[in-house]
Amino acid sequence: MDATTAPHRIPPEMPQYGEANHIFEMMQNMLEQLLIHQPTDPIPFMIDHLQLDNDYVPKILVLGPPASGKTTVAMWLCKHLRSNLLSVENLIARQFSSLAAGARQHYQKFKTLPSGLLVRLVQARLREEDCVTRGWILDGIPETREQALLLQTLGIAPRHVIVLSAPDTVLIERNLGKRVDPLTGEVYHTTFDWPPQPEIQNRLLVPAGISEGETARKLLEFHRNIVRIAPSYPKILRVIPADQPCVDVFCQALTYVQTIHRSNAPFTPRVLLLGPMGSGKSLQAALLAQKYGLVNVCCGQLLKEAVADKSKYGKVILSFFEKEIAVPDSIIMKVLGRRLDQQDCVERGWVLHGFPRDLDQAHMLNSLGYKPNRVFFLNVPFDSILERLTLRRTDPVTGERYHLMYKPPPTVEIQARLLQNPKDTEEQVKLKMDLFCRTSAELEQFYQPVLPLNGDQDPYTVFEHLESGIINPLPNKVP
């Protein structure tokens, strides 16, 4: 761009396209790969990297002491994510590899591998096509800080590191009941995870090195190493308690590896708040606008402002207001579109509430390019909605608003003159709730992924959940 023509007005479609297609992250990933591999000809290298389309494949380390269940969790993650599991055992068991054959002989003799040899095995395996295209999960690797540093030196960097943790007494007791299926490699337990099939039961073997003394020695070695490995992965490491059912451990691990770490990409929030009347959308929108500078766009308020300004559309809207009938969607979109196209909405972002109310309006909003990047659904029980709305009152003298339960009038005199808005009668509230329930499921399906929130709690607690949903990236979808 020509610097002399500043300030520049960037079309809103440009940042939306960049955000939707992860342009910033793509450029960042390419730069990382250039710095790691340092190719002599970077252009063909970048083209090949883009064609691989593997920036978001799983790259996971699963670490933990003996009997913590790390192998089981790693295998389940591998099946669920359709990735590749790498462990010391399957690396040295690979056929048609002279490196693996040498490592196998060394392991059979010394029951361990030198750090350099293990890292070379990992590096060779990660270069193969299936690991490049579908990612990888390392089970129990690295074992020492030296191995972690060697992996980092080669540019082998995980996106998620899981460390399982449990008391030593629990692990020693658990290890004594450990059994292994020699055909599948699945790990079972005589007490906690015994297979129901008799054929599997009959072929289970007792693994070597599970005695109490041997387990205690391995635990001591693990504790000595993990405190030196952990600082190598400061922002991507998650400790998960392993002293709970294996399914719960797996669920926590899966939830973590589905998260996306915060990006440095520029982000302009475009927030849509959905929910029944009385769910607190207006309050939450005001709080977001106050703290983050977003433009608070209330559809109903925009229509009233258009009428007050006596604009071209305002005169048309006034005629519908006077007849007490709904304003056509096309006119609403004209007014709403003019507001969302203004520069403050483009630069600072917006929080929209009160529109859309049905699937047709959502399609119309989407077709005109007004696509939210965060959609929240405030869920509030019907009884709470009735309590919030039917007990609202207004003082006609001062204009002060009261609630008979949460903010009662201070004097009997004021209470005697309070009036109820006709829209807040129980019949009207039930009618509007019925209309909302008819369309809410379609809206929720249209705007996937929707972030559901419990709106029946303290407003500032709801606001904290809103903040978290806006600041943190949306989780990955895993089939």
Swiss-Prot record:
Residues reported to bind ATP 1: A67, S68, G69, K70, T71, T72
Residues that coordinate or bind ATP 2: G278, S279, G280, K281, S282, L283, R392
Location (main, coarse): cytoplasm
Secretion signal span: none
EC supergroup of this enzyme: transferase
Annotated region (LID 1), positions in chain: 177-206
Keyword Membrane among UniProt keywords: no
Similarity remark: Belongs to the adenylate kinase family.
Subunit text: Interacts with CFAP45 and CFAP52; CFAP45 and AK8 dimerization may create a cavity at the interface of the dimer that can accommodate AMP.
Name listed for the protein in its UniProt record: Adenylate kinase 8
Organism of provenance: Sus scrofa
